[in-house]
From Swiss-Prot:
Protein name: Rab proteins geranylgeranyltransferase component A 2
Source domain of life: Eukaryota
Note: Substitutes for REP-1 thereby preventing widespread tissue abnormalities in patients with choroideremia who lack REP-1.
Function statement: Substrate-binding subunit (component A) of the Rab geranylgeranyltransferase (GGTase) complex. Binds unprenylated Rab proteins and presents the substrate peptide to the catalytic component B. The component A is thought to be regenerated by transferring its prenylated Rab back to the donor membrane. Less effective than CHM in supporting prenylation of Rab3 family.
Family: Belongs to the Rab GDI family.
Originating organism: Homo sapiens (Human)
GO cellular component: cytosol; nucleoplasm; nucleus; Rab-protein geranylgeranyltransferase complex
Molecular function as annotated in GO: GDP-dissociation inhibitor activity; GTPase activator activity; small GTPase binding
Length: 656
């Protein structure tokens, strides 16, 4: 059982999100004894990626409001000494709210997949549905977990040779199948056809149109191909010159992750989706811009690259919004829209001139490193990145435990410092420093914290929002707010070659800051860009839209920007990591991890390059024995010998 865990560590980290995983790798790399645990059965927390059935199991868990860990059978209060006090941790994960799922794909009763608990029909996307009780779906039982098992951390899906690059960027189509599982039960609400002939009538209409005939995709197909889906809980991209890419290369964690270029930046203007020119070549090849606009845009972008050298050009407008400043530059409305929403990707009302110029400069500086856009996307989803850092931690001696609940922090009354944690087995584990993800802190500790919310939608569609001759396109689109003061909606569309969805489908993520529930915030944008699969009447306009097969809406807590002083009674050696923020990049998570690491270990280098294998001195085999007779503790401690043999200089094989 858990008695096999050592009782003394330098650092105990609770939660396996991106900031915690980066910290785990940094601490382990600097020689600290690290215990990294999570109450959940999967790695990544709210940064995780799931297969389709795994996402349904995750959805069911939150709809039933289950505990984030198993109930303890130990009375932990008896383990607290007279000179100590306990700070309890939260029993339930309350970071996800307002989950609503809808299935628009047709139901094929001849397939060997049955679904229980269908929702009422919602043909217009705008009618409020009564949420029915969540029941189990009869899916084939899944017998494996894609996350770390009891003996090893998650290996890369294809073995890398010594000559492969450290940061691998690929444009090839799907060539590797990745399997991810999370339980064997699903929850689904469906929108089924009243009429068995609807799909045939749709096909008839489409046959007569000039558009190519689309494949008929059923819910059964989605379920059967569920392993091909890797659905992110949080939608983000990596700036090619951003902090996370630099950290991945420097630390050599990039050896565990592969990337694909984001191929298009799109704009939504006057009800139409169009491609935004980014590079100089794109600008002058664009058919959307006049020759005068092309020259104006190039002149302005050149200025943005070196705006700090020309303060007289913007000093008088420092207090103005960026949108107002763009008007003073005499850019056409078309160019203003492109710069504001598709290049700077900033808010029309709240972004200042300086912030807008800086965002534009950052966008331009990231162009050309790996492709024609500034962005990269990790193959198999965002969840690969925290797992990569966890693997690096394990390579240097970190111990990992999943489904391992922590009851409380043990605090010394005299010094006010945390001495230990008590887990759900009743084991007391001592450490010098403790790092915890915000969602684990109790309501009492967080009573003064004011959280923001993120509105999220995940869609499965049958074609791209902007069709071209190339079907394997990865795109990002910013949809401006319909009303002044509202938030823009960020849309990321992923094709099957990103290894996140099955063939002939697209996975679409929508994200914005919450003002209402996720469905209320995002449904209007969904209606603009997509048409439900179950609509009976399809006019010419709707034929150009992708058909919506499946949709999930949910709100996620945004704990970024919370100061340490907002938490009540936090011991000085307990450090808090936030969950995902609403931003497009991962800069906040990297900055937070580095800041906390420097606070804890001010003299240590943050995630230094790995050592030369010839310089590693082994102290003997210190592999931890596997816990006998237990299935609810997953432990992994990798010996560094095999891994270190293949470590190389991060820049050695980098391709631009």
């Amino acid at each position: 059982m858990a008695d096999n865990l050592p009782t003394e560590f330098d650092v105990v980290i609770i939660g396996t999100g991106l900031p915690e995983s980066i910290l785990a790798a940094a601490c382990s790399r600097s020689g600290q004894r690290v215990l990294h645990i999570d109450s959940r059965s999967y790695y990544g927390g709210n940064w995780a990626s799931f297969s389709f059935s795994g996402l349904l199991s995750w959805l069911k868990e939150y709809q039933q409001n289950n505990d984030i860990g198993e109930e303890s059978t130990v009375v932990w209060q008896d383990l607290i000494h007279e000179t100590e006090e306990a700070i309890t941790l939260r029993k339930k994960d309350e970071t996800i709210q307002h989950t609503e799922a809808f299935c628009y794909a047709s139901q094929d009763m001849e397939d060997n997949v049955e679904e229980i608990g269908a929702l009422q029909k919602n043909p217009s996307l705008g009618v409020s549905n009564t949420f029915t009780e969540v029941l189990d779906s009869a899916l084939p039982e899944e017998s494996q977990l894609s996350y770390f098992n009891s003996d090893e951390m998650p290996a890369k899906h294809t073995q890398k040779s010594d000559t492969e690059i450290s940061l691998e960027v690929t444009d090839v189509e799907e060539s590797v199948e990745k399997e991810k599982y999370c339980g064997d039960k699903t929850c689904m609400h469906t929108v089924s056809d009243k009429d068995g002939d609807k799909d045939e009538s749709k096909s008839t209409v489409e046959d007569k149109a000039d558009e190519p005939i689309r494949n008929r995709i059923t819910y059964s197909q989605i379920v059967k191909e569920g392993r091909r889906f890797n659905i992110d809980l949080v939608s983000k991209l990596l700036y090619s010159q951003g902090l996370l890419i630099d950290l991945l290369i420097k630390s050599d964690v990039s050896r565990y992750v592969e990337f694909k270029n984001v191929t298009r930046i799109l704009a939504f203007r006057e009800g139409k989706v169009e491609q935004v020119p980014c590079s100089r070549a794109d600008v002058f090849n664009s058919k959307e811009l006049t020759m005068v606009e092309k020259r104006m845009l190039m002149k302005f972008l050149t200025f943005c690259l070196e705006y700090e050298q020309h303060p007289d050009e913007y000093q008088a407008f420092r207090q103005c919004s960026f949108s107002e400043y763009l008007k003073t530059k005499k850019l056409t409305p078309n160019l203003q829209h492109f710069v504001l929403h598709s290049i700077a990707m900033t808010s029309e009302s709240s972004c200042t001139t300086i912030d807008g110029l800086n965002a534009t400069k950052n966008f331009l500086q990231c162009l050309g490193r790996f492709g024609n856009t500034p962005f990269l996307f990790p193959l198999y989803g965002q969840g690969e990145i925290p797992q990569g850092f966890c693997r690096m931690c394990a390579v240097f001696g970190g111990i990992y435990c999943l489904r391992h609940k922590v009851q409380c922090f043990v605090v010394d009354k005299e010094s006010g410092r945390c001495k230990a944690i008590i887990d759900h087995f009743g084991q007391r584990i001592n450490a010098k420093y403790f790092i915890v993800e915000d969602s684990y802190l109790s309501e009492e500790t967080c009573s003064n914290v004011q959280y923001k919310q993120i509105s999220r939608a995940v869609l499965i569609t049958d074609q791209s929002i902007l069709k071209t001759d190339l079907d394997q396109q990865t795109s990002i689109l910013i949809v401006p707010p319909a009303e002044p003061g509202a938030c823009a909606v960020r849309v990321t569309e992923l094709c099957s070659s990103t290894m996140t969805c099955m063939k002939d489908t697209y996975l679409v993520h929508l994200t914005c800051s919450s003002s209402k529930t996720a469905r209320e915030d995002l449904e209007s944008v969904v209606k603009k860009l997509f048409t439900p699969y179950t609509e009976t009447e399809i006019n010419e306009e709707e034929l150009t839209k992708p058909r919506l097969l499946w949709a999930l809406y949910f709100n996620m807590r945004d704990s970024s920007g919370i100061s340490r002083s907002s938490y009540n009674g936090l011991p000085s050696n307990v450090y808090v990591c936030s969950g995902p923020d609403c931003g497009l990049g991962n800069e906040h998570a990297v900055k937070q991890a580095e800041t906390l690491f420097q606070e804890i270990f001010p003299t240590e280098e943050f995630c230094p390059p790995p050592p030369n294998p010839e310089d590693i001195i082994f102290d003997g085999d210190d592999k931890q024995p596997e816990a006998p007779g237990t299935n609810n503790v997953v432990m992994a401690k990798l010996e560094s010998s095999e891994e270190s043999k293949n470590l190389e200089s991060p820049e050695k094989h980098l391709q631009n």
